[in-house]
């Protein structure tokens, strides 16, 4: 056993010496490599030891910094005698920044306070003006109601009268334009009639073949392709063709003017309907009126109808006025009297003439106004549909009468409705009773007479 241990010791000693001194059998280069490997291992172990020392030193440094901070806080507490000063303690530069921020915040607060005070003063002024205007409006309504001889429960509203006045002003302007158009048409036809009665005014035109009144069939045959080639190229034919073309252009121009007047009247009536709808919406929102189906479920007359009910001994109400939700007058085209009224909102130049015949009383239900509004909406939709489907056909459509008068406007409602969706009218579709008066441009300045 001892021998074995001795041999093992000798072998290990030999190996250790070979590692330190290098093996004697190896060349010098190999010995240097073995020495470098040993040095590398030693350096790595040394680096590990140094890294552990660095970690330990870093930990000790952090502990020392914490101890210093705690010591400073303790010294500050002992000096100032405040236990919470450590929480609010800041360095000098941070304290300066905080002071500057506080100064800016104080200035901003002063500006906001000044602005708030100014706005409060303006609000008080606006409230005072609103009160003054309310009192003024109330006085005006009372004075107007007293002048018109109305009741105290049914005070006429100034706003409603202004709205009605605006509508009537637009209608008056429209009617004046239509009257001027009718006067020009009458003057033109009067001149043509005088020339027909006095053929010597036209000079040589009375002896020509195409002078006089021609039927639509004759005009169509004259302008047809078959007969067009057989027409002689003479000054007489050229003059007749120019006269016919001028008359047709004048007729088309008149139809265009009629359509423009119709669109303008539609716009006026549309604004009127919008005003009435806003009035009804105001009544519904204020709770003074409900729809005819009695959505409130109470039954019977509404609160507004009960408040405004009374004797009808005041026929001297303002024309077109109606009690509003605040006791004022709403918008209506008929006077509020006990007698049956028959207002006629007739629109000329091919437009619809609506006639509303209703018996109005002091507590007349609002359903009648709704019916009138619905009727106006249907009429406007029909007219817009006609214009959208075939505007060219409406411009070239020929009628028996050369112009539209106030009495004939109501009758043209049926013609306009029947013409929706129909193709454009050509010369072959001219009615039998119509006539065309042909006269040369040079001497007579002829026009198209239908």
From Swiss-Prot:
Coiled coil location: 1-197, 259-286
Entries under InterPro entries matching the protein: Coiled-coil_dom-contain_pr_149
Family: Belongs to the CCDC149 family.
Name the record gives this protein: Coiled-coil domain-containing protein 149-A
Annotated source species: Danio rerio (Zebrafish)
Gene name of the record: ccdc149a
Chain intervals for the UniProt region annotation (Disordered): 290-358
Keywords carried by this UniProt record: Coiled coil
Keyword Chloroplast among UniProt keywords: no
Record bears the keyword Coiled coil: yes
């Amino acid at each position: 056993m001892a021998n074995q241990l001795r041999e093992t010791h000798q072998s290990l000693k030999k190996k250790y010496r070979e590692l330190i001194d290098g093996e004697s059998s190896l060349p010098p280069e190999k010995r240097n490599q073995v020495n470098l490997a040993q040095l590398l291992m030693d350096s790595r172990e040394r680096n590990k030891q140094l890294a552990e020392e660095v970690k330990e030193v870093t930990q000790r440094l952090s502990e020392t910094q914490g101890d210093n901070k705690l010591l400073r806080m303790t010294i500050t507490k002992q000096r100032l005698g405040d236990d919470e000063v450590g929480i609010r303690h800041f360095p000098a530069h941070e304290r300066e920044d905080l002071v500057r921020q506080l100064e800016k915040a104080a200035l901003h607060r002063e500006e906001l306070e000044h602005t708030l005070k100014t706005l409060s003063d303006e609000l008080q002024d606006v409230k005072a003006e609103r009160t003054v205007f309310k009192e003024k409006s109330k006085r005006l309504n009372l004075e107007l109601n007293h002048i018109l001889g109305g009741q105290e429960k049914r005070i006429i509203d100034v706003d409603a009268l202004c709205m009605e006045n605006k509508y009537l002003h637009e209608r008056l302007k429209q009617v004046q334009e239509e009257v001027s158009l009718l006067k020009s048409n009458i003057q033109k036809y009067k001149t043509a009639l005088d020339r027909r009665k006095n053929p010597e005014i036209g000079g040589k035109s009375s002896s020509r073949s195409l002078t006089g009144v021609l039927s639509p069939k004759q005009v169509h045959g004259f302008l047809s392709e078959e007969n067009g080639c057989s027409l002689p190229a003479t000054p007489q034919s050229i003059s007749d063709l120019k006269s016919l073309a001028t008359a047709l252009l004048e007729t088309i121009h008149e139809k265009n003017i009629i359509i423009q007047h119709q669109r303008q009247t539609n716009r006026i009536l549309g604004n009127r309907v919008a005003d009435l709808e806003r009035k009804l919406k105001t009544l519904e929102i204020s709770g003074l009126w409900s729809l005819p189906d009695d959505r409130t479920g109470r039954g019977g007359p509404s609160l507004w109808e009960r408040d405004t009910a009374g004797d009808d001994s005041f026929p001297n109400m303002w024309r077109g006025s109606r009690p509003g939700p605040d006791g004022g007058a709403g918008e209506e085209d008929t006077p509020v009297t006990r007698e049956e009224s028959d207002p006629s909102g007739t629109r000329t130049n091919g437009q619809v003439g609506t006639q509303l015949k209703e018996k109005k009383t002091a507590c007349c239900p609002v359903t009648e106004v709704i019916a009138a509004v619905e009727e106006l909406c249907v009429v406007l939709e029909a007219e817009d549909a006609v214009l959208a489907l075939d505007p060219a056909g409406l411009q070239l459509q020929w009628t028996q009468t050369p112009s539209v008068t106030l009495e004939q406007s109501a009758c043209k409602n049926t013609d306009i409705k029947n013409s929706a969706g129909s193709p454009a009218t050509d010369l072959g579709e001219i009615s039998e009773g119509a006539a065309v008066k042909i006269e040369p441009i040079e001497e007579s300045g002829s026009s198209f007479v239908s």
